[in-house]
């Protein structure tokens, strides 16, 4: 009975750790100023926006600074087609208030979740015999990884089959207004976030997460098999 309880708790702890890894990798991926500049140069985005690569980099990183709590406002002045303009309109400013609140909420989930996972692991170490602790934790991580994999596969199928449905549902789930429905002609935020940039961020984030995750999964699988023998 005690072992079953610990196993369930360790699955929860593993899911919390996976969530913490996800957010940490996303945070690290986003906070790369030079990468944005190099991407704008590579895509030739300035030809479409009329804004220099330097100004676009400052503009997108101001959004990140705001989300992280390092800036009080997203607003800044940029040069667009030779004229100095305010980068963001009121809709974008109000939408980013919601985005920052969501980002900070997930940051808290990461921080408190990691602390809770550590507490659960410590508790289970005290509740189980020394000989079976590592294998039990490994089995729990493998189970949690399977749950995560199933959820990720289902999400991936949804995205592949109907991306618009996924995108709209995502925003309606986390936002209670329609500020996220922006017009390309009036919202510069959309223009400095082309599809190529978004796709590259997703790929970088996925690779950054999968590397440590797969290493942990391989280690857990090896431990579980060795202990079983």
Predicted regions mapped to residue ranges:
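Juxtamembrane interface at the cytosolic side of transmembrane helices
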Residues: 2-11, 114-163, 215-229
């Amino acid at each position: 009975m005690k072992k079953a309880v610990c196993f369930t708790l360790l699955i929860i702890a593993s899911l919390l750790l996976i969530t913490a890894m996800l957010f940490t990798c996303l945070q690290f991926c986003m906070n790369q100023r030079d990468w944005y500049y190099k991407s704008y140069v590579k895509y030739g985005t300035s030809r479409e926006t009329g804004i220099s690569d330097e100004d676009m980099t400052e503009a997108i990183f101001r959004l990140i600074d705001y989300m992280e709590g390092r800036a009080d406002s997203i607003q800044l002045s940029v040069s667009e087609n030779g004229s100095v303009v305010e980068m963001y309109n009121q809709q974008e400013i109000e939408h980013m208030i919601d985005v920052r609140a969501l980002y900070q909420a997930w940051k808290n989930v990461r921080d408190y979740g990691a602390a809770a996972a550590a507490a659960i692991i410590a508790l289970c170490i005290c509740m189980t015999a020394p000989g079976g602790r590592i294998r039990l934790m490994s089995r729990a991580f493998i189970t949690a990884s399977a749950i995560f994999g199933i959820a990720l596969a289902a999400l991936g199928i949804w995205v592949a089959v109907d991306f618009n449905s996924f995108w709209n549902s995502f925003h309606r789930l986390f936002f209670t207004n329609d500020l996220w429905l922006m017009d390309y002609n009036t919202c510069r935020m959309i223009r400095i976030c082309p599809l190529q940039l978004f796709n590259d961020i997703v790929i970088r984030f996925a690779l950054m997460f999968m590397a440590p995750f797969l290493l942990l999964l391989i280690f857990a699988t090896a431990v579980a098999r060795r202990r079983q023998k």
